[in-house]
């Protein structure tokens, strides 16, 4: 709670997602209400299912009816997006966080799922799709091209986005220079 309030004091005018720690719906509702009371810029982060695999739709509906902004997280499938979307009204802002990077980690292409999610939620202008667990800078380009409203990126990925626009010829030169520096550091001889 103290750490969350510290974050909120630093981010007064930015949306902040804070996740519940519970696994049971009644406890998640209690925690969600408490978290929501900490500020107007909060999105209460709720998993799409609990640890037993049960869809949290009733929880989503209850909190949404109370006008609590939600960030439904750990989403991977179009079916999950459809179920979530059916639980949300068009009065309260919500985010659906699709874990694109983790999909890629297991050899699945997240692009068709994000694309379909954007289409599914298009009729509800209060619902935004978030590209989560970004693994590489190009994910930023993919998300932007698809019309994904939000992308989360760790600092090491954000710093690489500044390289966008570099020519491939310059990239070749930079790569060869790196090879030369690495070979000198190795002190190997042929």
Model-predicted segments: where are they?
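Active-site beta->alpha loop and helix N-cap motifs at the rims of alpha/beta catalytic domains
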Residues: 1-62, 66, 95, 100-103
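Alpha/beta catalytic barrel-like cores
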Residues: 1-9, 154, 168-177, 181-190
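Sequence-level detector for tyrosine residue identity
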Residues: 3, 43, 76, 138-140, ...
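Structural signal for hydrophobic packing residues in well-ordered secondary-structure cores
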Residues: 8-11, 36-39, 88, 118-121, ...
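General "foldedness" signal
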Residues: 30-34, 49, 56-60, 82-86, ...
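Catalytic alpha/beta core domains of metabolic enzymes, predominantly
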Residues: 68-159, 165-180
